[in-house]
Amino acid sequence: MNGSKKIYLGIGLVALLMIFIYWLMPKDTANASSQIESTNASAIIATSPGQQNQLSENTTPFGSVSQHDTQVNCQLQLNAANHLIVNEQTRNCFEYFLTQYGEKSLTQIDQDIKNYFTQSLPQPARDQAQDLWQRYLKYREELGNLKEPAIAKTDIAYYRAVFTSRQMLRQRFFSATEIAGLFGSEDIYNQYTLERMAILNNSKLSEIEKAKQLKALFDQLPQDWKANLEQLSKLDDLKQLTTSIKKNGGSAQELHDMRTNLVGHDATARLEQLDVERSNWKSNVTQYLDERQTILNSNMSDTAKQNAISALRSKNFTAPQDQIRVQAFESAKDQGQSLPFSE
């Protein structure tokens, strides 16, 4: 298999893994990741105005046809001695060029990025970037050679094995500092996700114990990650644990304790108020549908039935949005579908 095909497989493997591991990654995580990996601001110098103008003027030759209206995504950073600072921005730059594969050959991509470095970077950063790029290419090629673990994909051990093999592969091509810069943010999230899965899948823990451990795990995250992941992560944890408690016939107290451990007293109070509102809505809709069915089963004319149902709907649901909402339940019931109540 030639190198370009292996690069392609490497890209495919990364895409497959990211579908799994970034299943709750918020859209602005990339920004958070950049903040996590940032070095002391005083040690970083931005590209000079002259260099910025040059990069803007030379954007088109480096992009593919599908990227003709975009700027080159290469926010490379240098320190005061013009040494390359290896961080997620560096990796993003490499990946920007690699996404052109298919529209351009790997040889053309390689030449483009070298030309880009020549035009945009002073020495010694230029040579450092080119050397790192060559090693990154080899790393991506070897990703395509990694063997899939002989473990069911439903088992967390499968993903642990995949990430372990990737970490070992990185050590062949990069220093510890480079690994931290290129992959540090990804590793933080990967480790968090794997540990979170392990807690949720631990049958030896009660839902209350899971909530405590999930809260402790979340509290260990860097502050920037907490800000991005808090809502999505906790909502998903709440959904899974709540479903489990209800499925197993858990008590209201167990549900209360789980929520309190996971999101605190104030949020639990709001959730319990929402439970009351949902319960009232479910009761009202169920009663309305029963009365509506009685009308439909009566001997009245079709016109009389529709008038009676409209009057019944207006009586039970005064808010216009509720009247529209309940019609979705009417349709579901008429078609023999499950009623779309929120749980």
Curated annotation (Swiss-Prot):
GO molecular function: unfolded protein binding
Keywords, in A-Z order: Cell inner membrane, Cell membrane, Chaperone, Lipid degradation, Lipid metabolism, Membrane, Transmembrane, Transmembrane helix
Function summary: May be involved in the folding of the extracellular lipase during its passage through the periplasm.
Keyword Cytoplasm: no
Family per similarity comment: Belongs to the lipase chaperone family.
Domain of life: Bacteria
Membrane protein topology class: Single-pass membrane protein
Family annotation (HAMAP family): Lipase_chap (MF_00790)
GO biological process: lipid catabolic process; protein folding
Ion transport in keyword set: no
Protein name according to UniProt: Lipase chaperone
TM segment ranges: 7-27
Organism, scientific name: Acinetobacter baylyi (strain ATCC 33305 / BD413 / ADP1)
GO cellular component, as recorded: plasma membrane
Entry's localization field: Cell inner membrane
Main location: membrane
